[in-house]
């Protein structure tokens, strides 16, 4: 099935046009791309390994992808998480931590607190070949050694302190039995 993306201005106003996946995006126009980092009560991050035949095959990343036409950023994050891992999250459970504009993309980074054993995951075989929970420090080591996608390495470079702060807050909240609030 052919996928289409809605086009936006840099300030996220929908242009009323869409473009087919793979087609060049006109200069000054953007589409939405999401990443969603799943963090468990121990403060570990869920990573998925890209299948070898995909771009950056064999590298580790957080769930993510493009918002398809008619879909909000938040809806795309929830959908991508479920498609790639089988983890169900409600829109109200995911927190938009920050956004960044790069090239032709409006990139949105979400975090969700989910405790799911690896053997309960349902991996999307066309995208993902493995999954594991890692500590923040291990994730940084993996990024430094080229084991993650460039996107993950870039998020750590730009917002690593913020990511660590959110992970620490999830761990503290889980111990206290309180809902997580992480405002950046």
Which ranges hold each PLM region?
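Acidic, metal-coordinating catalytic segment for phosphate/diphosphate chemistry
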Residues: 1-35, 41
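Short loop segments at secondary-structure junctions
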Residues: 11, 40-43, 51, 113-118, ...
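Hydrophobic alpha-helical positions that pack around
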Residues: 63, 77, 81
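Nudix hydrolase/Nudix homology domain
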Residues: 57-58, 101-184
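Active-site segment of metal-dependent pyrophosphate-handling enzymes
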Residues: 32, 52, 74, 82-120, ...
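A glycine-rich, hydrophobic loop/mini-helix early in the fold
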Residues: 33-64
């Amino acid at each position: 099935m052919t996928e289409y993306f809605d086009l936006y201005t840099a300030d996220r106003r929908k242009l009323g046009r869409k473009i087919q996946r793979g087609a060049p995006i006109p200069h000054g126009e953007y589409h939405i791309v999401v990443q969603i980092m799943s963090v468990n009560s121990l403060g570990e991050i869920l990573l998925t390994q890209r299948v070898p035949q995909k771009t950056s095959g064999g590298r580790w990343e957080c769930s993510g992808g493009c918002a398809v036409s008619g879909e909000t950023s938040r809806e795309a994050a929830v959908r991508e998480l479920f498609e790639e891992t089988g983890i169900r999250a409600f829109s109200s459970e995911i927190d938009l931590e920050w956004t960044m504009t790069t090239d032709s993309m409006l990139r949105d980074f979400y975090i969700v607190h989910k405790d799911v054993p690896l053997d309960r995951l349902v991996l999307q075989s066309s995208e993902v070949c493995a999954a594991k929970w890692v500590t923040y420090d291990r994730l940084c080591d993996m990024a430094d050694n080229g084991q993650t996608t460039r996107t993950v390495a870039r998020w750590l470079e730009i917002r690593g302190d913020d990511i660590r702060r959110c992970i620490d807050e999830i761990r503290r909240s889980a111990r206290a039995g309180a809902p997580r609030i992480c405002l950046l």
